[in-house]
């Protein structure tokens, strides 16, 4: 029978239950259920042989839905944790949530009718806030788990839990007993919209803020001993000029600051003489549109203790010295209001100035502001002060000034600096110890160390009190008679015990007799409990104590903290401040920071632009699934591994499509490997290393190189290197090279042939190690591969199988250098084959005969050995025709005959030509052979396939049907 197709069922085609399509929306939850049902994470975290590894979770805020930044953060953490698990360490990951604070309180209040808010007691508000936070935690927890993130989701840490609150009060108490906590009347960032003090980490600086800046003169009324002989003649009309961007603070002005080391000039301005910094005379001439003439100069320190008249109030103020005064802007003299600025306050303390802060909690001028009382400082107050200065003849100029100005991060409204009674952590008391601790930490990227060092070096004392109800109370009482705070070891320990048992609601539920320890219930004094709560950064900054140090199986210091780069001024800082203050060391050994997620054009994501990427839609798809297809969690995880997280990272629809393409390539490669192992059992069929052909040993060398690189990528947290290496391995090394060549021996050989089993040996090694390598990132795909292995393994899950297993003997650089040359030749051959294919000279490369010339004699001998003319002495693998996927290869002694060919390439060292193959096409392997047609029994077969068919018939594996076709015998 000579009809084509009679042998097509005699080839070994791939078989696997591993789908080509991921169907992630259905399959990923099934795999997550498998992990949960078999407690894979729990067993490994308890029973792995290595030491304990704790990546301590920075708590997201329990408010609203998760955004793409949450996904980036949690997936990075999970990638590290899973790598450590595969390395054999006992990974203990406890996810956490930040549950107190103003944003949740505001959410609760927004959901209550205005008329009912007045009836809301602090306790009822707290109950509603707790309920809101817990519901949000539950919702966010499900989302995080859908990302494939492993951890102790059954028992996360919540800052509202009694045991956490008690540990936090313990940290506060230790700091207080060491003298690091004090109460002071100082300027703090104050949010009129929230009516509470804010920490620096609760501020944001939006683009586009414009202030009304003013240049103002104050009339000099008295000169210091040093200045008098120099300036006395100008005194009747001598004035100091100041510049400010906060006109509303002028009623709080008590001094004017100069830099002692700057030179100041007296300039003639019309009828007046003005004192300004000499370096700014030229700039001010232009700004104030006035021709200033320098009359005299003198050092700033000469003006100390001179006096001036406030232009709006019947009081004089001194000229004082401050190193912070510069010539970067303004006049070189700074209007100083100790109640409205940190540096102003410090100068005020130095010179014994009063603390004047004539503004109340909602940002309204008090009676101390005289005619401005009742005006809101940021609205009518600014305008009124400017008009009053104009009327007093003290206003030189007003202009708009665009600059960075602090806003409340939650209400998105401007804040002010306002002196109030607050509780502070005295950072000065332990600043040097914190700086020393920072130097012991491994910061990734390295510039993080400079960033946090600079912030801690320059920061002021930490205002830790808040005037809100939803938080952990500051455990202090005040003496009714004296107002003195009662805060000592006995009171803190007593309250800590109550909170541990009943939670912080007890502060509002219990009366003083229950909250005070025994001696203070009857000491002749009466006390009232404080109403302030702690800054939420103190909440989360105590997590090392409440979680790492308190939970038995964890570790303190933790191995790692990992958050966004904004946490250098947030959680990283509050954590190291509290840890160093109480225990003298950092709470972490390594700190890794990542950037923010931007769109593909590098813009911030915002609903108004419409460029927001919602992780839930990435995973499950949007309403329009053509527009927003369901990619599943692994594609999202793959994106996280692909970016250089050290800076801001882009994401959008095009990038997601690219990630999905890479995902599919890895999946299709894995599917090919699985499909061609369907009849392979490593225990019985694996070929020993010394018996492998050169090509297979070269691939094991490449596997060693590739997976060593992958290991180094994970160890150095450079996940983008993992992404590039694995993608390149799957596409370039496997699909385009090894697997392309392997198809012939996998499909055409007898099932148990050495050339096939040796290839399957390499496929199994590649597949198992690929599954392990991708498991930290493509967790679902890796598990899907492992569960689809067609042979038994001793490990229930890919994660239980440990990290990649590479044998020393596989490393063979000498062999690799030979095969690198062969691959380069193959590339050139492929280019000529492609040219012939494009111009329809050939269809498949098997229709071609390759003519090859090399100038190097040694290489020529090596190629001769790979090109047996009769098949004798060959292992039927390491042959040029298989390498090039051509039916024949002819080695030329000289390149001169190549010139006559239509399809050819020549260089100084290499010549390639392509012509049509000799003979006819074999119906089974599709190679061309002059043998086809010679056999009476099998005229359609080549001399390679004929004996294979005869052997398969003899072994009873195939038989001839009545229709004259060969088919496998069913067992």
Curated annotation (Swiss-Prot):
EC numbers on record: 6.1.1.5
Subcellular localization: Cytoplasm
Motif 'HIGH' region location, chain numbering: 60-70
Cofactor note: Binds 1 zinc ion per subunit.
A GO MF term: ATP binding
Xref: SUPFAM superfamilies: Anticodon-binding domain of a subclass of class I aminoacyl-tRNA synthetases, Nucleotidylyl transferase, ValRS/IleRS/LeuRS editing domain
Catalytic activity as recorded in UniProt: tRNA(Ile) + L-isoleucine + ATP = L-isoleucyl-tRNA(Ile) + AMP + diphosphate
Annotated positions binding ATP: 607
Domain comment (free text): IleRS has two distinct active sites: one for aminoacylation and one for editing. The misactivated valine is translocated from the active site to the editing site, which sterically excludes the correctly activated isoleucine. The single editing site contains two valyl binding pockets, one specific for each substrate (Val-AMP or Val-tRNA(Ile)).
Name of this chain's protein: Isoleucine--tRNA ligase
Protein source organism: Acaryochloris marina (strain MBIC 11017)
